[in-house]
Structures are given as C-alpha cells and as structure tokens.
C-alpha cells in the first residue's frame, strides 16, 4: 500500500491518477469540515455542485433541499445558507438533503477520477477518515491519495498542513505503508504549522477573521472531534451532482 499527497487539484491533470485509489479530499476552511458537521447534525445526503447554476438547478428540481453555497467566503444570492460549520452545528438536519457548492472544496471532489472512492477529510474527522481510507484500501487492494483543494488554484497552507496530519495518522495506523516525498513534505509542514499557528498564518483563516466568521475556526482547526466520514457514493442522474453520505447511514432512494 502506498500513500501520495497532491497539494493542488491541477497536479492530477499531469498524470493519470488511478481510479482504484482511495482519495481523501481536504478543504479545511471550510467545505470538508462543513460536510462533516452536516452529517453530525443528521443530514441524509449532501450533493456537491461545481457551479452556482448547478446548485440552484438541483434545488429547483427537488423542493425541500437546503441550498448551501459560498463564493469568496460569502453566501451567494438566492442560497439558504453559506458554508459555515458553526452555522450548521446549530441546525437540526435530521434526514435532510443539502446541496453545497464552494469556491474550492466541492470542485476538488470533481477533480478526482470519476469512478474513484472519495472521502471528505479535515482536522475535525482526522482519525475517522484515515481509518476509513485504510479499511477501504485493504478491501480494494489499492493505494491512498490525499488531495488538497488549494485556494483558487494556489497552494493553501492549512490544507497542506492537514494533509501532513492525516499522513501521520495513516502511518500510526498502517506503519508499513510506502510513502513518497510529498508525504515527508506535508508532515514537515504540519509539524511547523499545527492548528494553533495556522490560526494566525493561513490566509484563509485571516480572511474568516476579517469577515467576522472566526467562530468557524473552532471547527476547522480542532482535531478528532467527529467520527463522521462523508463519502461520495455516486452521481445523481438528474443533476450530475456528486452524492455524499456518511457510510454509517443508509440512503433510501425516493
């Protein structure tokens, strides 16, 4: 079993990423943290959209869905909610379906090979998501890849540091896994920039503070508070959106 880390979705365009790999997609601030909180609050399904138009159309097709979105940290016009884990932590989402589109995180999910297994990872569910990835890698006799969502195509410090943290967790649980240079680099970044320092250094963190959304950092920069692991299970035929569920839940088709 091997572990590779990609610091930007664009890296996947230069190779032929194996479809059989297990991909952990990271957007610490905030998409993958938010998805994890959504399932903690009882969500039945989260549908990930690449564009605002796709999300709005998916909301129109199925009344009752909660339309969630973010562009440049703000909630787009016409959306019910933004991309705030702190906001969703106060909501009862039991058996609800949510549509989510964000600047970086949901797009990164689409960047993975179409038929690949994709998990949403973050500091908040670090131990749980790595354990699930290892379980699936053994089950499918495949490797693990960690993909950082980055920020508008640029390197994101918090995603890379979280990749290092998840790599440490994988090595702790699976010490014989073969690692590559990218893993060494990510672990070194995490050791230099743990969450307590990311709070002050990561541009995404500074942007949230500047826009009065610092409450989200209490979720984005906290380790191992959740056992929820959002997982892509397919594509919704009517909308083309990625369907995510928490593996412990059962999705009943309507």
Locations of the language-model features?
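Charged, flexible boundary elements
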Residues: 1-11
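Short acidic, Gly/Ser-rich segments with clustered Asp/Glu that frequently serve as metal-coordination loops
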Residues: 10-13, 23-37
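Active-/binding-site microenvironments in catalytic and ligand-binding cores
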Residues: 19-21, 29, 37-46, 51-54, ...
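Phosphate/ribose-phosphate-bearing ligand recognition and processing surfaces
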Residues: 149-159
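Long, charged alpha-helical interface segments
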Residues: 80-107, 111-117, 131, 157-254
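Acidic/Gly/His-enriched mid-domain segments of enzyme catalytic cores or analogous surface patches
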Residues: 47-137, 147
């Amino acid at each position: 079993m091997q572990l590779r880390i990609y610091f930007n979705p664009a890296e996947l365009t230069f190779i032929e990423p194996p479809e059989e790999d297990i991909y952990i997609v990271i957007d610490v601030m905030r998409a993958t943290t938010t998805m994890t909180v959504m399932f903690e609050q009882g969500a039945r399904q989260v549908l990930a959209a690449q564009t605002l138009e796709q999300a709005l159309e998916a909301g129109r097709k199925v009344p009752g869905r909660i339309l969630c979105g973010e562009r440049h940290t703000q909630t787009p016009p016409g959306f019910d909610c933004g991309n705030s884990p702190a906001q969703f932590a106060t909501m009862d989402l039991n058996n609800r379906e949510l549509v989510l589109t964000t600047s970086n995180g949901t797009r990164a999910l689409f960047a993975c090979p179409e038929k690949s297994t994709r998990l949403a990872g973050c500091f908040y569910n670090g131990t749980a998501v790595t354990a699930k990835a290892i379980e699936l890698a053994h089950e499918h006799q495949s490797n693990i890849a960690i993909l950082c969502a980055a920020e508008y195509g640029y390197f994101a410090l918090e995603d890379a540091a979280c990749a290092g943290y998840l790599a440490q967790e994988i090595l702790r649980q699976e010490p014989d896994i073969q690692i590559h240079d990218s893993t060494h680099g990510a672990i070194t970044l995490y050791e230099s920039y743990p969450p307590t320092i990311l709070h002050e250094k990561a541009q995404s963190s500074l942007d949230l503070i500047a826009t009065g959304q610092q409450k989200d950092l209490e979720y984005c920069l906290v380790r191992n508070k959740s056992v929820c692991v959002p997982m892509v299970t397919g594509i919704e035929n009517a909308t083309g959106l990625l369907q995510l569920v928490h593996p412990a839940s059962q999705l009943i088709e309507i």
